[in-house]
Structure formats: C-alpha cells, structure tokens
Amino acid sequence: MEFIGEEMVNDAFNYWLEKNGFEARVFGLENAFAWNPYSDLIYYSVVMSEQADIMFYEYVDELGLKYEIDNFWLAFLHELGHSETWCFVEEEDYDIPKNITNYDYYRLPREAVATEWAVRFINEHADLVRDLTRIVGPVIDKFFELNEIER
C-alpha cells in the first residue's frame, strides 16, 4: 500500500538528523520500527502494538527515563540509538533466539544498548527531543490526516 506524504515525513526526519549531526537517515515506512546496519537507514511505523508499547515503556522506566515521551518518538530514538552504538555491539549479539518474549527481547545486548542510548539522549537533550517533535510532529499529523489513519 502506498501512502500519501511519506516523502515529506522522511524529509522532516532527515532535516532534524542532519541539523543535529547524525549520520543515520530515515528511509521510510515499514511494518515496524527498524534500523539497517548496512545502510544506516531508519524505518518508522505508524502501526504500534499497544501491549508491546506498554511493556517497552515499563522497561524504559526501569532505565531512569526522566521525561514522559510518546512511544513513537521513543521508538525512533531507540532506532537512532542502534546507529549510534552499533560499533559497541558484537556481531553475535545480533542473533535473535526463536520464541523470545518481548521482556527478553528488550534485554538483548544490542537492544539494551540502543534503548539505554535513547534514554540517556532524552534525559540529557530534552531540548533536541522537543525540537524533533516540533519539526516532525506536525508533518506526522498531516501524514495521518492525509491517509485517514487514526492515532
């Protein structure tokens, strides 16, 4: 399915990334948030699992998140965290065991490092996170409106 306005969302994300000196870029919409280590591209999703969101947010709270933040932004910053920390993670840490629970998945070394980076970034750079939501937020809202997607 093709969505109206996907390119404007990508452009808004990439503007913020470039403005703040990040090398990663946003490529587009997928079924889930993801980061590709070979291309350093981030994919975002408009479909979020409510149960997974709750469990992820509980995990993030354990890490000492100081600010309340929507899971969409948290998921994006987690993927950016993969880009920023990939050199600290061993290749075998990218292996995912079969039938893993969300609880255990969040604690895999590569996932934990990316989430810890995101939490630290949010806690230490609240101004940049506000800037992210100010720049990309209205574009995401317009994207949802154009595609008649409920939030």
Each language-model region and where it sits:
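Alpha-helix capping at helix-to-loop junctions
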Residues: 82, 86-90, 120-127
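Long, well-structured alpha-helical subdomains associated
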Residues: 102-109, 116-151
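Post-HEXXH active-site segment of zinc metalloproteases
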Residues: 70, 86-116
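Short intrinsically disordered terminal tails
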Residues: 1, 88-90, 149-151
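Zn2+-dependent metallopeptidase catalytic core
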Residues: 4-21
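A structural signal for well-ordered alpha-helical segments within the folded catalytic domains
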Residues: 7, 70-74, 78, 112-116, ...
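Active-site scaffold of zinc-dependent metalloenzymes
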Residues: 25-70, 80, 86-87
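Juxtamembrane/interface and other helix-to-disorder boundary residues
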Residues: 3-4, 49-52, 61, 143-150
